[in-house]
Curated annotation (Swiss-Prot):
Tissue: Four types of regulatory chains are found: I-alpha, I-beta, II-alpha, and II-beta. Their expression varies among tissues and is in some cases constitutive and in others inducible.
PROSITE patterns: CNMP_BINDING_1 (PS00888), CNMP_BINDING_2 (PS00889), CNMP_BINDING_3 (PS50042)
Name of the featured protein: cAMP-dependent protein kinase type II-alpha regulatory subunit
Organism field: Rattus norvegicus
GO cellular component: axoneme; cAMP-dependent protein kinase complex; centrosome; cytoplasm; cytosol; germinal vesicle; glutamatergic synapse; nucleotide-activated protein kinase complex
Length: 401
């Protein structure tokens, strides 16, 4: 077989698309790809002063009387303000930094040294508070977040100080602890303010993700404090680990018997919408009688399914809970209430530490139609178990009694 040549630019093209998928978590990868590459094509047709896709729309929102820029519609209040597009410089029309390292999310990271900036307990607390609402950190597990916090460093800024300048190479991602900052964009030799940050938020990720020069200038309008994360650590932990987690989810979903009948594209849609939750030993995951909002697949650990007995009482005089099922890795629970549109028929408890993949009810109804017959058959299976346990056919469809 002849050697297959990879066309120049293909790797970078696919990396850019992959990074944007990881950032935005679109529900449909095909539709998102069409939109992404259409924008990219249109951007390349523009003049030399055009800017490359994926264009990121920043929404000006009012917060304490000061407009705050937040990415991709993640707003805290409704606003009719016009969308402000902050241009992202094109790597096809500008020279990319010669010192910016090539990045592939699939490469191994075992030999990558961890960056640690020592912090006092007081600094660590302030950093955790500043980072708690940062969108890019939401999908990190505890270990990944700990690595990020270890690697971040404090930067004190003064009024009128330029934190980053449009056109410069990206070196750090910044999280705002305090202070106000203007966002300035220069185009056609004219500089204008496109928004502000007011004591919260983050900036600087775009240049690190796309290996492009800074898209805007950030100027402090008051004294303040920032937490910085260097480019290498940012890309290694946030981008690469998210890519690896996606692959892990893909592999795990393929191993779940319930999904065997699904097409590959259908399984990939499931991967796009699932989240991950961790439960401690004895922690209650779902509660009998409550409204159902999620479906659970056990990624690791064991889960005990219990139902309140109508004949047995506990030491407090209430209905005693009796185990009717014990679930392991790859098994699922919580589907019954979603299939029947009834309250939870049983409670579920973690046995030891448990990690679950979680899908909300909207995604469940949208994506698991082909699996519905299998799950409905489980209703009769559960009833058989109850007959064996209690000697009667309890009504699973009325669990709140």
């Amino acid at each position: 077989m002849s050697h297959i040549q990879i066309p120049p630019g293909l790797t970078e093209l696919l990396q850019g698309y992959t990074v944007e998928v990881l950032r935005q978590q679109p529900p449909d990868l095909v539709d998102f790809a069409v939109e992404y590459f259409t924008r990219l094509r249109e951007a390349r047709r523009q003049e030399s002063d055009s800017f490359i896709a994926p264009p990121t729309t920043f929404h000006a929102q009012e917060s304490s009387g000061v407009p705050v820029i937040e990415e991709d519609g993640e707003s805290e209040s409704d606003s009719d303000d016009e969308d402000l597009e902050v241009p992202i410089p094109s790597k096809f029309t500008r020279r990319v930094s010669v010192c910016a390292e090539t990045f592939n999310p699939d490469e191994e990271e075992d030999n990558d040294p961890r960056v640690v900036h020592p912090k006092t307990d007081e600094q660590r607390c302030r950093l955790q508070e500043a980072c708690k609402d940062i969108l890019l950190f939401k999908n990190l597990d505890q270990e990944q977040l700990s690595q990020v916090l270890d690697a971040m460093f404090e930067k004190i800024v003064k009024t009128d100080e330029h934190v980053i300048d449009q056109g410069d190479d990206g070196d750090n991602f910044y999280v705002i602890e305090r202070g106000t900052y203007d966002i300035l964009v220069t185009k056609d030799n004219q500089t204008r303010s496109v928004g502000q940050y007011d004591n919260r938020g983050s900036f600087g990720e775009l240049a690190l993700m796309y290996n492009t020069p800074r898209a805007a200038t950030i100027v402090a309008t008051s004294d303040g404090s920032l937490w910085g994360l260097d480019r290498v650590t940012f890309r290694r932990i946030i981008v690469k680990n998210n890519a690896k987690k996606r692959k892990m989810f893909e592999s795990f979903i393929e191993s779940v018997p319930l999904f065997k009948s699904l097409e590959m594209s259908e399984r990939m849609k499931i991967v796009d919408v699932i989240g991950e939750k961790i439960y401690k030993d004895g922690e209650r995951i779902i509660t009998q009688g409550e409204k159902a909002d999620s479906f659970y697949i056990i990624e690791s650990g064991e889960v005990s399914i219990l139902i309140r007995s109508k004949t047995k009482t506990n030491k407090n005089g209430g209905n005693q809970e009796v185990e009717i099922a014990h679930c392991h890795k790859g098994q699922y629970f919580g589907e019954l209430a979603l299939v029947t549109n009834k309250p939870r028929a049983a409670s579920a408890y973690a046995v030891g530490d448990v990690k679950c993949l979680v899908m909300d009810v909207q995604a469940f109804e949208r994506l698991l139609g082909p699996c519905m017959d299998i799950m409905k058959r489980n209703i009769s299976h559960y009833e058989e178990q109850l007959v064996k346990m209690f000697g009667s056919n309890l009504d699973l469809l009325d669990p709140g009694q």
